[in-house]
Amino acid sequence: MSKDAPVAEGRTHQFTTRSGADTIDVGRKLAGLLKPPQLLLLRGELGTGKTTLVKGIAQALDAAEPEEVTSPTFTLIHEYDGTREGKAVKLFHIDVYRLESERQLETLGLDELLTPDSIVLVEWGDKFKSIRKRATGEIVISSEGGDARKITVTLKE
């Protein structure tokens, strides 16, 4: 499978945003589509709004307010406790940009994070075959010029 090929074939949803606030709003809407367990790739160039989207998802899950959600580039994993439909849910936001090998990836303990009540969002996960194979979908964010973004979400059936 090509790094650029879609990970999942199934339900596809597209959104266009014009600002960071719009991207957060889309994240809030997406939270309703994400049923645990999920492992989703977050794909997009630097600065396209991957973490901004996660802010909305975390807020909708009552896991964190947007200002509390930051990029996990240096810490690798941020964990948030939330709820979905009255049930506890764990939201993991992972950034593997700085990892260079599958061996380094193994030290994150991804298997332990993938539980029946977890939603795992992985930035730059398309770098690793093991993550691409296990992904249940992907979110692709592309710049449309200025602050405009196209967000394409594909979830496996």
Labelled PLM ranges:
Residues 69-92:
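AAA+/P-loop NTPase substrate/partner-engagement loops
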Residues 59-68, 82:
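Post-Walker A helix-loop "phosphate-sensing" segment adjacent to the P-loop in P-loop NTPases
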Residues 2-29:
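N-terminal pre-Walker A segment at the start of P-loop NTPase domains
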Residues 40-42:
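Hydrophobic anchor at the beta1->P-loop junction of P-loop NTPases
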Residues 50:
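Conserved lysine of the Walker
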Residues 31-37:
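Phosphate-binding P-loop
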Residues 45:
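P-loop (Walker A) phosphate-binding loop of NTP-binding proteins
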Residues 2-6, 13, 100-157:
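Short phosphate-coordinating micro-motif centered on Lys-Gly-acidic
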